């Protein structure tokens, strides 16, 4: 079983389009708990406490607070029938609006490609844990690396513990996890994978220095989105097919191994 993990985007929108929400995320009660924790910070420390946690400018603080206050935790599928919640809820893959998602361009995929996404892709999230592309989500601000202590956990890595790994690659499923997530998000999953799971991390380089790929954040985000789209277009089911990826990059076997595939920008070859 092939499962792909990617990071979310900071930019979000309540996408008003024709794409239907297909169910709710797997950890709705945990999400509600984290939402309460954010409200507790505002009540006890004021908006400054949240500004420090979110690491946002004065200009962004107001919109982030509005997003927090408009958030209505969804605890069951029936909550999607609530107009106040429904108008703020969209399929996750349409809600995130960063470079990676623009490169993926799910809004122009056909039905078979979207079905592949829903079956094989997991979007990691500080607030939701992990979601399928068409699970309903609301705009929020909470990065996985945020220093948010909740209950007995000193941060979100402790809060989520092995929950995400168990959802993505259940014990006994012999899952291959294709890691297209940033280090910040990948470490919420990879250390907790069961022994029968395997991981392949894809790195995208703009050149080579001292025998290592030169990675640049913006280019890597764009390449990750392109790879997800390419996998959906080719309905990839076997990790061995990844080396054929050729959208602006080429597999570079000299720097790769069984757990890490390196792709270099074609202009650098």
What annotation goes with each model-predicted range?
Residues 104-269:
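Internal, well-folded beta-alpha domain core
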